[in-house]
């Protein structure tokens, strides 16, 4: 039996998680937010006051951490941390943790194991190129920096967090640079991925487009 695997890649704030989650609900398939796994590890790094440049200790932490998905909730060492991993500080630091080759190898292995034997939609930075290179459908979502910063601004404002939108733009550009320039599994479009620019589109517009593309595979 062949299982459906949908890979959604793209930069920070392009709408990957929101769209992937909606598609998972529509198709009744498992959703895996791989970015949440890197955020969970970053949360643990910061909680333990580990220097973000101390790669050796971060790798050891990754080797000794239990990061799990249960019913779309993210658990770190048995504790649900859905809200904790969405802080501004983690937004700024997660790319530094995610660029470490050994960390990516550990988490990619875990992601592939989760995908085995079931229909999945997975979003991240290197799903179509590295995690699920033989995915049924590969999508690369993008949007302007201004649009992505505005989305993040509104998301944080909804949670009662006041931020400067110009600072968010700078943070997004910095994350884009780190993600695309890292030596191992950088953020790049898979050759066979379909680009969708979500600037100005509603969530439902993008969801419908991807579901229609899947029907044509």
From Swiss-Prot:
<comment type="similarity">
    <text>Belongs to the cytidylate kinase family. Type 1 subfamily.</text>
</comment>
<dbReference type="GO" id="GO:0006220">
    <property type="term" value="P:pyrimidine nucleotide metabolic process"/>
</dbReference>
<dbReference type="GO" id="GO:0005524">
    <property type="term" value="F:ATP binding"/>
</dbReference>
<dbReference type="InterPro" id="IPR003136">
    <property type="entry name" value="Cytidylate_kin"/>
</dbReference>
<keyword id="KW-0963">Cytoplasm</keyword>
<dbReference type="GO" id="GO:0036431">
    <property type="term" value="F:dCMP kinase activity"/>
</dbReference>
<keyword id="KW-0418">Kinase</keyword>
<keyword id="KW-0808">Transferase</keyword>
<dbReference type="GO" id="GO:0005829">
    <property type="term" value="C:cytosol"/>
</dbReference>
<dbReference type="InterPro" id="IPR027417">
    <property type="entry name" value="P-loop_NTPase"/>
</dbReference>
<dbReference type="Pfam" id="PF02224">
    <property type="entry name" value="Cytidylate_kin"/>
</dbReference>
<keyword id="KW-0547">Nucleotide-binding</keyword>
<keyword id="KW-0067">ATP-binding</keyword>
<dbReference type="InterPro" id="IPR011994">
    <property type="entry name" value="Cytidylate_kinase_dom"/>
</dbReference>
<feature type="binding site">
    <location>
        <begin position="10"/>
        <end position="18"/>
    </location>
    <ligand>
        <name>ATP</name>
    </ligand>
</feature>
<dbReference type="GO" id="GO:0036430">
    <property type="term" value="F:CMP kinase activity"/>
</dbReference>
<protein>
    <recommendedName>
        <fullName>Cytidylate kinase</fullName>
        <ecNumber>2.7.4.25</ecNumber>
    </recommendedName>
</protein>
<dbReference type="GO" id="GO:0015949">
    <property type="term" value="P:nucleobase-containing small molecule interconversion"/>
</dbReference>
């Amino acid at each position: 039996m062949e299982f459906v695997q949908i890979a959604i890649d793209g930069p920070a704030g392009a709408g990957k998680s929101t769209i992937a989650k909606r598609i998972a609900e529509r198709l009744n398939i498992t959703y895996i937010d791989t970015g949440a796994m890197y955020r969970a590890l970053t949360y643990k790094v910061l909680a333990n006051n580990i220097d973000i440049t101390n790669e050796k200790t971060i790798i050891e932490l990754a080797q000794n951490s239990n990061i799990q998905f249960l019913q779309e909730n993210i658990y770190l060492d048995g504790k649900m941390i859905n809200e904790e991993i969405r802080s501004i500080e983690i937004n700024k630091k997660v790319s530094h943790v995610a660029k470490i080759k050994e960390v990516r190898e550990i988490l990619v292995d875990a992601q592939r194991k989760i995908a085995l034997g079931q229909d999945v939609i997975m979003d991240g930075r290197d799903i179509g190129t590295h995690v699920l290179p033989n995915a049924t459908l590969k999508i690369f979502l993008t949007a302007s920096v201004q649009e992505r910063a505005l989305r993040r601004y509104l998301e944080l404002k909804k949670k009662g967090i006041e931020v400067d939108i110009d600072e968010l733009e700078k943070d997004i550009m910095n994350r884009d640079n780190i993600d695309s320039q890292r030596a191992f599994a950088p953020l790049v479009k898979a050759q066979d991925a379909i680009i969708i620019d979500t600037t100005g589109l509603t969530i439902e517009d993008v969801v419908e487009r991807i579901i229609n593309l899947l029907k044509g595979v």
